[in-house]
Swiss-Prot record:
It comes from Arabidopsis thaliana. Belongs to the snRNP Sm proteins family. Keywords: Acetylation, Cytoplasm, mRNA processing, mRNA splicing, Nucleus, Ribonucleoprotein, RNA-binding, Spliceosome, Stress response. CDD domains: LSm5 (cd01732). This is Sm-like protein LSM5.
Amino acid sequence: MANNPSQLLPSELIDRCIGSKIWVIMKGDKELVGILKGFDVYVNMVLEDVTEYEITAEGRRVTKLDQILLNGNNIAILVPGGSPEDGE
């Protein structure tokens, strides 16, 4: 396995994030930050200690969840260690 992150396969990079905080930007108006517990070949993911950010007509709604299963088809971007506040 390569040590240089630019030479990693996407699945290897995601695998290195297991047990760490990850920022998941979904298709649509939802973003989630949580601890990645696992994923499969379809990039379906299990996150724990999750904060969900949703953009609504009233503004940004924040929801705390113990655990969530995400469908990989709805994931647009993964940011290891990041969160929406990092961009503000």
